[in-house]
Amino acid sequence: MMDGRSILMGRYEVGKQLGQGTFAKVYYARNLTTGQAVAIKMINKDKVMKVGLMEQIKREISIMRLVKHPNVLQLFEVMASKSKIYFVLEYAKGGELFNKIAKEGKLSEDSARRYFHQLINAVDYCHSRGVYHRDLKPENLLLDENENLKVSDFGLSALAESKRQDGLLHTTCGTPAYVAPEVLSRKGYDGAKADVWSCGVILFVLVAGYLPFHDPNLIEMYRKICRADFRCPRYFSAELKDLIHKILDSDPSTRISIPRIKRSTWYRKPVEINAKNSEAATTNSISSGVATTSGSAECSTSEENQGSLSLPNLNAFDIISLSTGFNLSGFFEDTHGHQEERFTTRQPVTTVLGKLKELAKRLKLKVKKKDNGVLRLAAPKEGKKGFLELDAEIFEVTPSFLLVELKKTNGDTMEYRKLVKEDIRPALKDIVWVWQGDEHLNSQSILQGEQQQSPLPPELPQDQLQPSLPQQEKQDMPEPPLLPQVPQEEVQTSIPAEQTKN
């Protein structure tokens, strides 16, 4: 604590609670160094572990690090203590798109088109990275201060590698009113096509102000979804009706794809330009496919310049595993067949490189210098499983604090472990401060001077919460109708999907 304020890890001043869920609370916070407003999601580690959601947390971290896009909520960094996991997220000042619709009512087609463009661009980018959201809905679409859309909540997302041999996903998840028919069937489904369906439901909601599929009886609602039984309001333009019927096609094999959506007449109409932040700037960022952030865990490639070596930086999540007390490697990573060794050092990078080269010379290992502080060390003789090779990569935690990772890239694991134990560890003892996993070390001292954990912010009375702040996480509850159903006199008979297919 400093001056009566709640300070987390010596880096963030924590303010009012924004929302609360079963396993986490979300707080507004400010970066003490940059002054940047952020949202911090505090996850109760014990609760998550008890209900077996470790893999879901791990997946959410992996996916949010993988996806860097202007219309995807940015994960700046992840921190942890013994009892909590902290997601430091981009603060979406505009709140949920759901709340905007509930407060202001249905949008004009021009306004809806702008949000739909951003949604489709974000989803298309996620799919290009092998990520399928699987829970797209207005509650998971946030708005920044310029009312640009941000896709959030990747807790139910799937990676392409999650597919079975048939190339399909098999886990039923998502919110019932937005879920595609093939997902409800509990058979294999294409994650990309299921996301497209959800985008269609969202588009309908934006312009109509209510859900296309809703019934007090959940089974009846499922039947409506599986039959694509819905009606468009009379005020929908012909082009919008045509597009929605092609998206909300119960047959995934004939459902319109994202490239075809982008070529549709309605989609290609001019988009409203936000006066605060022009669409052109967003488009330029989208075309690059990358949003650069200070907390990104991805390392940029650098080359030596005038004799100096540029090293990749590590954020707080990357150095959590430096001590036993903060070690989450078993929680976030598959430790079976562990093939990495890590140590920290306060020696300069030139000393570390010199020591590694000296070690290689003594062991008669071939040395190949790579970019970004990486040395490839290779055994001169072939072993049980080919030539043993390992990479030594150096990361900069702070200018005076380095992390060195030794990782086997080829050869027999037992030979690698023997080499580390009998040769590498003894040879590097003069420069090593601590090897990861050494139990005799004081876990808290490793991060001394880098991070100081302060008490968590106290519980805030509900009457102190600002109603204008977005609720970024809510209790799980049965899906209610988004808004009251439109009067029947405003509804016209739907056009059969078969008549709208190309």
Swiss-Prot record:
It catalyses: L-seryl-[protein] + ATP = O-phospho-L-seryl-[protein] + ADP + H(+); L-threonyl-[protein] + ATP = O-phospho-L-threonyl-[protein] + ADP + H(+). GO terms for biological process: signal transduction. Disulfide bonds: none annotated. Residues 12-267 form the Protein kinase domain. Its EC number is 2.7.11.1. The active site is at D135 (proton acceptor). Transmembrane segments: none annotated. CIPK serine-threonine protein kinases interact with CBL proteins. Binding of a CBL protein to the regulatory NAF domain of CIPK protein lead to the activation of the kinase in a calcium-dependent manner. This is CBL-interacting protein kinase 11. It comes from Oryza sativa subsp. japonica.
